[in-house]
């Protein structure tokens, strides 16, 4: 794949630059801190310098903000055209450029949510980077890319569209055994949603898994769905909401025991792989306070 030159300023784009543009294409917005962690090994000054070059080239731009707020970056039309010229947009669903530009025009509440999703993505990347046997080959935060329709238990046979906040995989290597793939869907709770909504979404994921729909999407056979286990990670605002959600999942019909794992935002940002995750199956039992590591 040839790397195009910027048409606004005479710069040579590096592969890392295209990775930055691709990530902005998927997630719509991120901050300099996010970019520093994902692309510059935490070196914020290096990130600032390169992002300034991309801004001067007209490939990315900054949303209006108050002086006390962090800069929030987004992909410009020239950035989209650069991805198109590099052939990268061919890897995604086909949309015209005006549609893709409108996708970046979102309100402040949506921006806050998407930045919270990026906080989660960065936390996982930093935690995995510290463990040599782990890697994250894919972490997508564009809901459309991993959406699915499923016959929901409460929809009386009607198909329901589920749009995850994210999907990612952690690959765990070992000297003797084959690489183990941990697959996760991500939901970052906005706290404005009812517990019933979160339970309903969890039921949709469970139906998608048990029906073999996810296995088919992974290139497997519907009948061999157990060969493609998934976990749904729900990130909530407080221990109180975490515990109430766990109890609501157990009380659902049918009960949701273990496909959904729940953690608070505060715990996740500190140690996403650690023993912070609560399983509904343990709610209300003697192990009510038990939590588990994500990758044992």
Predicted regions and their residues:
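Electrostatic, structured charged patches in enzyme active sites and in nucleic-acid/phosphate-binding
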Residues: 1-18, 84, 88-296
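Nuclease-adjacent, charged terminal/linker segments that flank catalytic cores
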Residues: 1-105, 296
């Amino acid at each position: 794949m040839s790397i195009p030159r910027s048409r606004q300023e005479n710069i040579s784009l590096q592969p890392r630059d295209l990775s930055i543009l691709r990530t902005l294409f998927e997630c719509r917005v991120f901050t300099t801190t996010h970019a520093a962690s994902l692309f510059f090994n935490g070196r914020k000054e290096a990130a600032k310098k390169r992002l300034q070059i991309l801004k001067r080239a007209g490939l990315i731009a900054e949303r209006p903000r108050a002086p006390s707020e962090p800069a929030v970056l987004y992909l410009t039309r020239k950035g989209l055209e650069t991805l198109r010229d590099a052939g990268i947009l061919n890897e995604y669903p086909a949309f015209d450029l005006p549609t893709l530009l409108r996708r970046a025009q979102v309100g402040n509440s949506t921006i806050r949510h998407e930045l919270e999703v990026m906080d989660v993505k960065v936390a996982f990347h930093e935690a995995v980077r510290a463990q040599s046997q782990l890697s994250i080959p894919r972490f997508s935060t564009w809901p459309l890319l991993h959406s699915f329709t499923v016959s929901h238990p409460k929809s009386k046979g009607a198909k329901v569209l589920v749009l995850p906040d994210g999907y990612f995989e952690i690959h765990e290597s070992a000297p003797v055994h084959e690489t183990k793939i941990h697959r996760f869907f991500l939901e970052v709770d906005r706290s404005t949603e009812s517990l019933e909504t979160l339970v309903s979404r969890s039921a949709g994921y469970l139906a998608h898994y048990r029906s073999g729909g996810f296995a088919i999407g992974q290139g497997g056979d519907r009948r061999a769905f157990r060969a493609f286990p998934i976990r749904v990670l729900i990130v909530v605002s407080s221990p109180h909401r975490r515990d109430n959600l766990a109890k609501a999942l157990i009380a659902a019909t049918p009960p949701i025991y273990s496909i959904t794992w729940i953690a608070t935002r505060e715990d996740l940002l500190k140690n996403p792989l650690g023993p912070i995750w609560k399983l509904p199956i343990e709610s209300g039992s003697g192990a009510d306070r038990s939590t588990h590591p994500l990758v044992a």
